Amino acid sequence: MAKPLGTTGEFFRRRDEWRKHPMLSNQMRHALPGLGIGVAAFCVYLVGEQIYNKALAPSKSSHHHQEQTAPSH
């Protein structure tokens, strides 16, 4: 037999009812099944692109030309 909850148990049961709400359950995860993996893959792509761009960026010492500014009139 289950023991009656009493006022304290009833208070905590009511307080935690929001956790079982259908909108907060796995419904969103099932609605967008690949979103987490897609976001993670996109972040890896962005980091990889930044590393690639920094590795292939020409250093300032390899450029020997200087920019000429147009004279102001």
From Swiss-Prot:
The portions of this protein that span the membrane are: 31-48
Which GO BP terms, alphabetically? electron transport chain; photorespiration
Q: One Pfam annotation, family name?
A: NDUF_B12
Location in the cell reads: Mitochondrion inner membrane
Report the GO terms under cellular component.
extracellular region; mitochondrial inner membrane; mitochondrial membrane; respiratory chain complex I
Print the keywords alphabetically. Answer: Electron transport, Membrane, Mitochondrion, Mitochondrion inner membrane, Respiratory chain, Transmembrane, Transmembrane helix, Transport
Top-rank taxon: Eukaryota
Membrane topology per the record? Single-pass membrane protein
Family, according to the entry, reads as follows: Belongs to the complex I NDUFB3 subunit family.
Subunit record text: Complex I is composed of at least 49 different subunits.
The task this protein performs is described as: Accessory subunit of the mitochondrial membrane respiratory chain NADH dehydrogenase (Complex I), that is believed not to be involved in catalysis. Complex I functions in the transfer of electrons from NADH to the respiratory chain. The immediate electron acceptor for the enzyme is believed to be ubiquinone.
The protein in question is named NADH dehydrogenase [ubiquinone] 1 beta subcomplex subunit 3-B
User: Which species does the entry assign this protein to?
Assistant: Arabidopsis thaliana (Mouse-ear cress)
